[in-house]
Amino acid sequence: MRFIMPIKYKRMLLKLSGEALMGKDSYGINTGVLEFVAGEIKELVAMGVELGVVVGAGNIFRGMAGASKGMDRATADNMGMLATVMNSLAMQDALERSGVITRAMSAIPMQSICESYIRRRATRHLEKGRVVIFAAGTGNPYFTTDSAGVLRALEIDADIVVKATKVDGVYDKDPMIHDDAVKFEHLTYDDVLRKGLKVMDAAGIALAKDDDKPIMVLNMSVAGNMKKAALGERVGTLITA
């Protein structure tokens, strides 16, 4: 049964960092975190939010890290994209075990594991109330999953990109290291690019700017944050024109 609530963002693209799925572990997927996120998503779906999800792969393999150690960059990025498929399948499993109908769609065809990404089919899944998890990034090397998240948000005409991380917004420096880090409540795309803030890569910010797609950065581990985001309540950092 769906609740009638004053939803500001009817269709959302949720970008989950792979590192956040580790929880307090040093590698891989923390099942407790996975189940928590599934519960938060289930609440969004019950509200009537149409949700697309892009998951990173930093908990398993990061292409840039492989390239920095001498690997061919395209090969390393391909490995990273495959790692996102693993995370996407884990997320799909957690959601379906919680009763949320979910479809994983991969930008790299692998029909025996999940659907191939087709924009019109993805949109139809969303219209039917299914959560769609977009795996394998953009399907091309040299693009981060942050850029993939913004790209998919534009393609499905999402109202907002919500980047869920381990911190409660955007700071002028890493709050995990610096106690005097200052949090921003609101930023413009140009602020992010000019200040070199580590929100997401410049390509993703530029893509959002071109389409005037708002980005919200919030702490994934705080219960109710994603619900607040959908309702338009102030949480985390909002990035707009």
From Swiss-Prot:
It is found in: Cytoplasm. Inhibited by UTP. PANTHER family: URIDYLATE KINASE, URIDYLATE KINASE PUMPKIN, CHLOROPLASTIC. The gene is pyrH. CDD domains: AAK_UMPK-PyrH-Ec. It catalyses: UMP + ATP = UDP + ADP. Its EC number is 2.7.4.22. This is Uridylate kinase. ATP binds at residues 15-18, 58, 62, 165, 171, 174. It comes from Desulfotalea psychrophila (strain LSv54 / DSM 12343). The keyword ATP-binding applies. GO terms for cellular component: cytosol. The keyword Transferase applies. GO terms for molecular function: ATP binding; UMP kinase activity.
